[in-house]
Swiss-Prot record:
Miscellaneous remark of the record: Bacitracin is thought to be involved in the inhibition of peptidoglycan synthesis by sequestering undecaprenyl diphosphate, thereby reducing the pool of lipid carrier available.
Main localisation: membrane
Enzyme Commission no: 3.6.1.27
One GO term (biological process): response to antibiotic
Similarity comment: Belongs to the UppP family.
Entry-linked InterPro entries: UppP
A cellular-component GO term for this protein: plasma membrane
Record-given protein name: Undecaprenyl-diphosphatase 1
Single GO MF annotation: undecaprenyl-diphosphatase activity
Function: Catalyzes the dephosphorylation of undecaprenyl diphosphate (UPP). Confers resistance to bacitracin.
Amino acid sequence: MSAISIGQAVVLGAVEGVTEFLPVSSTGHLKIVEGLMGIPVDDDAVIGFSAVIQVGAIAAVLVYFSKDIMRIVSAWGRGLRDREERYHHDYRFAWWVIYATIPIVLVGLAAKPLIKGPLASLWVVAGSLIVGSGVMWWADRTGRHKRGEDDTSFKDAMLVGGSQILALLFPGFSRSGATMSTALMLDLDRVAATRLSFFLGIPALTGAGLYELKDALGTGAGAAPLAVGTLVSFVVAYASIAWLLKFVAKHTFNSFVVYRIAVGVLLFGLLGTGVLHS
């Protein structure tokens, strides 16, 4: 069992908070930082710690979008009681989110041995970072960016939600990267693509976080580091979400494309030189 210090918990919480919702792969970043700090990345306590602090980032997106979430849930509840309310976009969108989550749940359960086994390799993470960069570049370049959030359809939700499977099977692809790229291919504007990515990710991230939490708490990572890391993750993730929405309103995704390639190359280098082990 590996003890994680308070200082290391702060660093890892910050890394998780920054990268969980940016299209850059939180998994790859956490593994790199853990390796550089001399923390054994395959230790049960470390794996458990990473799973728990993710809950802080999930809480951040729930708080940040709380008004939107309450509006959508309220519309859904009204629609269940009143047929006239079922024509409201928020009511339909609530069902779309539910339906769009089903594919990733089914694949996650069916492919769990692969996901926890060979597909968890850092070589896969590094390769997925670079391949995902190419997909993101192409999507941002060819997408027409003409459709807003109110123009989203059931088809959009299913395709974007289903694309989360890419990140599940190839973790370096990044859940945010996969969903945002898919939304851009569907001609959504960058802000709409980003917000849709957040909304469709909430059920999957929350479910996965709670599922991992029950096992992670028993790994012996330490209560104080867990609390600190989770709190830091929450604060940093909240700021990261706010920054990302402002950034994509004025910029392309090219900065993320270049950065992802650099991180992928760095990860290949660390693996090749033995600094990190897959």
